[in-house]
């Protein structure tokens, strides 16, 4: 949420979606490099080199976990030393003191037209999408006997599509087509993607479904973030985008739980088919969004 708030601070409304795309591209490269690093480093079994540490929790996946920890520490040090406040003092809003750890309060209406529908639509979309993400490796192993390296290739493919679509299409066309229309197109692409994955019995069908999903999410995420930012006054960007991202994080908690229970209780296809139907709700909600005013 901090990264997107910074983009909102330093871009004009008419260029907001282009700025958000760069955040999306960064995440896409994370999708490409992260699984590649994880898949390759998983082949290094630290238990063979440090057997005395097994009693302290060392396991076959400790190497990728250790690399992730080191990268997180580097990121923390870099941000501590280099990150500066991006919003000028005269544009900053007053501090909000009525913060709460109650997730229900995230759904409390905000007084900015369009923000509430966007927030709820984003929450519902991410519930379905994160459920797919979480159960995807289960399905790939159950139906096609995918190994950890096969899973890495799968997520590299997703990241490549996201980077290609956001860098080559969304960045150029979002300002012309409009963030609302592009978000609706993205949601519409997710539906056949989920259905194809639910039907997949071969890698070819699986990858076709993943291409739909990656393309759809590439359109939705930067455009919805941009819409929330455009609908919100500049001095409240951090608050509004923070709530938007918090609802996304909550969806990423609920979605995998529901999808996993559905997967193991009712079968591997059910969470994907039900997710496709469920996406009709945010598709309808987002179609009711007001056209953003860029002036």
Predicted regions and their residues:
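A membrane-interface helix-boundary motif in multi-pass transporters
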Residues: 43-69, 261-279
């Amino acid at each position: 949420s901090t990264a997107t708030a910074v983009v909102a601070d330093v871009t004009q409304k008419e260029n907001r979606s282009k700025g958000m795309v760069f955040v999306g591209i960064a995440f896409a490269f994370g999708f490409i490099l992260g699984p590649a690093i994880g898949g390759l480093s998983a082949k290094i079994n630290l238990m063979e080199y440090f057997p005395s540490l097994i009693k302290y929790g060392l396991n076959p996946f400790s190497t990728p976990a250790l690399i992730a920890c080191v990268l997180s520490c580097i990121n923390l040090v870099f941000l501590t030393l280099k990150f500066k406040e991006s919003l000028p003092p005269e544009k900053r809003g007053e501090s909000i003191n009525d913060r709460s750890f109650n997730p229900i309060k995230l759904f409390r209406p905000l007084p900015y037209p369009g923000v509430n529908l966007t927030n709820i639509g984003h929450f519902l979309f991410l519930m379905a999408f994160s459920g797919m993400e979480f159960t995807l490796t289960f399905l790939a192993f159950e139906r096609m006997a995918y190994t950890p390296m096969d899973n890495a290739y799968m997520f590299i493919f997703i990241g490549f599509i996201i980077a290609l679509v956001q860098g080559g299409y969304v960045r150029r066309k979002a300002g012309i087509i409009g963030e609302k229309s592009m978000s609706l197109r993205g949601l519409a692409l997710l539906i056949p993607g989920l259905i194809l994955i639910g039907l997949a019995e071969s890698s070819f069908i699986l990858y076709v479904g993943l291409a739909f999903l990656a393309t759809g999410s590439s359109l939705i995420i930067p455009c919805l973030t941009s819409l929330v930012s455009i609908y919100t006054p500049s001095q409240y960007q951090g608050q509004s985008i923070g709530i938007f991202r918090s609802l996304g994080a909550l969806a990423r908690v609920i979605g995998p739980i529901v999808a996993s229970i559905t997967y193991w209780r009712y079968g591997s296809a059910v969470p994907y088919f039900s997710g496709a139907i469920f996406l009709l709700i945010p598709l309808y909600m987002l179609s009711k969004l007001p056209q953003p005013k860029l002036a």
